[in-house]
């Protein structure tokens, strides 16, 4: 039986709708475009085109993964962040739009102080590469504990021809030479509590738990980074964190107790507390 593009899209949309996709028609179209290696305009222009059996078989494999709830970014192997097409894999978190708020605030502070930038827990390299793309004369370093993540970030830098970003594997500050100083340190660290029910829902089910979960009510890694960051910050440098919507007070308290100054929490595009930043100064203001 011959199957047209229009018929395949209709059947795929119905399957994904039944499996609970939030955007079944869009998902179906994107997956078919991926299999055909064609833009979406092709589907609209040639709705009566007959699809070959290998194409249908490839589409069904992708649909099965999506019906099981696997994130589209992992199925496609790519996600856009800060207008940069980034390769992603199950070894890294999927870059999210809310994290662009962290990039915006980092760029604001980078304009106030010269020096290199550091991204801790870099994953795909999304934050580091966004900053490097906007600040081509500044060196940006990204660090991730997982070797496969650091390698993926390097691959993304190469694919995007971004030459002022470098990536290392290691635990937080461990790969850095003693005496290395940065104008800004940014991080989207693990900040979810171990028993958070959201860990069993949606895309998060498929993402690496080590990049999501932290002890001490989700604050352990934020506390660790905050404690050691002054050793690597220039005088007047800034530390910026992405964190959970209900962690603003706790993160501000951590920074205040450690002597950071000019501490503020900023909201994401939905109006939720999302980024907290503080400034390191060798002399405390009166």
UniProtKB/Swiss-Prot annotation:
One example of a Gene Ontology biological process annotation: methylation
Keyword Methyltransferase (UniProt): yes
Positions that bind substrate: 188-191
Residues noted as binding S-adenosyl-L-methionine in the record, renumbered to the chain: 121-125, 144, 172, 188
Assigned EC number: 2.1.1.297
Keyword Cell membrane attached: no
Reaction equation(s) it catalyzes: L-glutaminyl-[peptide chain release factor] + S-adenosyl-L-methionine = N(5)-methyl-L-glutaminyl-[peptide chain release factor] + S-adenosyl-L-homocysteine + H(+)
Pfam assignment, any one: PrmC_N
Superkingdom of the organism of origin: Bacteria
Keywords, sorted A to Z: Methyltransferase, S-adenosyl-L-methionine, Transferase
GO molecular function, one term: nucleic acid binding
UniProt cross-references to Gene3D superfamilies, sorted A to Z: DNA helicase RuvA subunit, C-terminal domain (1.10.8.10), Vaccinia Virus protein VP39 (3.40.50.150)
EC top class, as a word: transferase
PANTHER family documented for this protein: HEMK METHYLTRANSFERASE (PTHR18895), MTRF1L RELEASE FACTOR GLUTAMINE METHYLTRANSFERASE (PTHR18895:SF74)
Family: Belongs to the protein N5-glutamine methyltransferase family. PrmC subfamily.
UniProt function note: Methylates the class 1 translation termination release factors RF1/PrfA and RF2/PrfB on the glutamine residue of the universally conserved GGQ motif.
UniProt protein name: Release factor glutamine methyltransferase
Taxonomic path: Bacteria, Pseudomonadati, Pseudomonadota, Gammaproteobacteria, Vibrionales
Gene encoding the protein: prmC
